[in-house]
Amino acid sequence: MSINIKSISYSFKNKTLGSCLDISVESGEFAIITGESGIGKTTLLNVIAGLKKPDHGEIYLDQKILNSESVFVEPENRNIGYVFQDFALFPHISVTKNILYASKEKKDDLLLFKKFVEALNLENHLNKMPYELSGGLMQRTAICRSLMMQPSLLLMDEPISNLDHENANAVQLLVSEYVQKRNIPCLIISHDIDQYNEIKFSKKLHIS
């Protein structure tokens, strides 16, 4: 499984960014995306996820065309896990239901649910509603949900920005194991690569 982005450009705040941007991330690899605040890093992930159409270019996920001049695959058909910076939890359902929302209802889902919940220290919060959670708990819930969908590609926007050192390490260890075991690519936006002491980045992309 790999993600290949060819000659992508996209509009952002009346500017065109990423002109002829090329990215290739292979199976089991991590890529980090850096750049000044407001430069369009999140917009790039939105383009990859299908939440925004690029102006030009092509996106392939394991040889399947997601974007081209003649093809546009809708977000729900891309099998991409996306951890949003603002978490994007469903406000009127519990932590458990948020996590299981994207579950594919396979036999091993219960085991995965238990593993992820324990790894991210969510056991005591499963019956709570999102408004009862701290920013860190919401972030871990969103990460857990994205892993439960068993995606072919994982996108993460500042996934440890609200976490203390212990929980940040727990997230990194779980995600690193998950990406390598499932052999999928992962793209992470971060303002500080030094936060990531448990993840090895194969690719670094700076947007300016």
Language model regions located:
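Catalytic Walker B motif of ABC-type/P-loop ATPase nucleotide-binding domains
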Residues: 154-158
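Conserved ABC transporter NBD signature motif
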Residues: 57-68
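Hydrophobic anchor residue at the start of the ABC signature
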Residues: 143
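Helix-to-loop junction immediately C-terminal to a conserved catalytic motif
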Residues: 49
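A short, proline-enriched helix->beta-strand linker immediately N-terminal to the Walker B motif
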Residues: 148-152
